[in-house]
Amino acid sequence: APLTINAGGIWGHGIAAKAGIRVDMFPAKGSLLIFGHRINNVVLNRCRKPANADILVPGDTICLIGTTSSRVGFDEVDDVRVTPEEVDLLLSEGEKLAPALATTRILRAYAGVRPLVAADNDPSGRNISRGIVLLDHEVRDGVPGFVTITGGKLMTYRQIGRAHV
């Protein structure tokens, strides 16, 4: 093929390795809660350094609070779950943004893994960009016809494909 696109998400490092290329990934687990009532009409976002539960987003008849961020091992990425501790953290931090969350029913809890490109100076992963990363391996590694696209958030994966394929 004249061009191979590695869009393997959190498994992208393994695909790149098959081509003799090193892509250091940072598997960042994130959890969020969906509530059964829309309690805000605009996005509420804390003006602070990135942290857990710093955004409350309205949508139709619901709202969501999120997210958490923690590094997980590659052996855990296929089976991430929202923990009771994460629920407690999201609730306690979310109630600081909107006290009404204390009495709003949780409909669902979601967890996923962000396929972030690792940064040497950020072992926590909190300051790694959540933006889309396009690695041209001809420029970067001398391997023509091979690119890796990764990063982003679970909710933007379709935008990634639309913008770069």
Regions picked out by a protein language model, each given a short descriptive name:
Residues 1-3, 7:
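Core beta-strand elements of the Rossmann-like FAD/NAD(P) dinucleotide-binding domain
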